[in-house]
Amino acid sequence: SKAKMAIAKGEARAAKIEGITPAEIERKIRLDVHGRPKPAMRGWIHAVATPLALAAGIVLICLAHGIGLKWACAVFMTCSLVLFGNSACYHLGDWSPRVTDVLRRIDHMNIFLLIAGTYTPVSFALEPFWRNSIIAGMWICTTVALIIHVIWISAPRWLYVLVYIIFGVSGVAFMGLFWMSPYAGPTVVILLCAGGACYIAGAIVYALRKPDPWPKVFGFHEIFHTGTVAGYACHMVAIYMVIVQLWP
């Protein structure tokens, strides 16, 4: 229509004045819900991680001994697929405002799911009492965090990061148990801590919005996404080592 053409011409004229290229305008319309052009890599890191997480999860399930541990690995795989898959869809797709809001809420909640999903199979390295206590505690905290995120989606960025960090380091309280476990040991503890450090480092970059090395291609948000993938990889290897140690 004439109205849409007039609006498009006005946007193009404003973009020319601000020095924004047509390619950046297209990216802005397709991807950015905040009115800012997104880097070209936005969403692609998690898009690539999604099929890799599926393959890794299937391997863990096949290697796990016992129905309980297999289900625990399935929980970990599901949580990782939901995180990476939803993030890729959210950042790459051109969605309506309602769909964007739903994907954004899920995106903000997923890291809590992945942390709880990680401790679900790892805790099989411990005695049943501690295993059940950790799994129950993690999922109760996750449920509370999810409720907060659903109700207060517009919470300040710093609050999201604070809750994220507290949740991420909460497992430190159990590291002594994993260290002494014959089915885990120092290597598993180091991997769990390294994964947590990757999550925290990424969260700090996300909160500070810097470093922002190449804003048009690979910015601060991509560093955050890289941190989540690196943390996931560390934890996936830790789960693999526990599974191998639990073989009869």
Regions found by a protein language model. Name each.
Residues S1-P248:
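Multi-pass alpha-helical transmembrane bundles in non-GPCR membrane proteins
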